[in-house]
Amino acid sequence: MKRKLSLAEAVEAARILFEMNAGEQGVLALAGRASLPHDTEEERTRLLTEWRAFAHASVMYALMACAPNVVVVEYLRATQGMLRGLGCSADEGEEFVDGAFSAYADPLVRLQAQECPAVFFRRLLGWEVSEVPAQNAAVVSGVMAMVLSAVMDKLEQYDYALE
């Protein structure tokens, strides 16, 4: 039997899933495995922004598939607070939503998740996937697929009791 979540619990569960999949330590470990630039502060910031945008879009997509629309709306409303918790200013939050997040949300809502690695490499490195060493592209693509699948699996475990 599925556990029933209230609106507040559903948004909190989504927020936790975002945090679990967007943590700095995990993203930097991925960068090391995939030979992504992350030595300078600027490189780390760009990498974290791109990965967090993908993670946020993944949670939004899974909510769209599993939960009532009101949960999606409330999760998206919580975005600025989540970004402030990561040290982003209001302006940086707006840039994140309008730029990086939108870049990943677009293929996901079109049911074209396979485009996300191309978006990632294009935005982070200015390269097409074909220009990225195959092993590095496979690592990033595989982790993206696992994140999306894990978030979807987790959110499918709940019923949403919003009355």
Please place each PLM-identified region on the residue numbering.
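Polybasic, proline/glycine-rich intrinsically disordered low-complexity segments
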Residues: 10-27, 76-146, 163
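Helix-start/N-cap signature of alpha-helical segments
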Residues: 6, 44-48, 93, 113
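N-terminal leader/targeting peptides and immediately adjacent processing regions
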Residues: 1-41
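Acidic, serine/threonine-rich, charge-biased low-complexity segments
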Residues: 1, 38, 133, 162-163
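Short, solvent-exposed secondary-structure capping/transition elements
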Residues: 60-74, 88-92
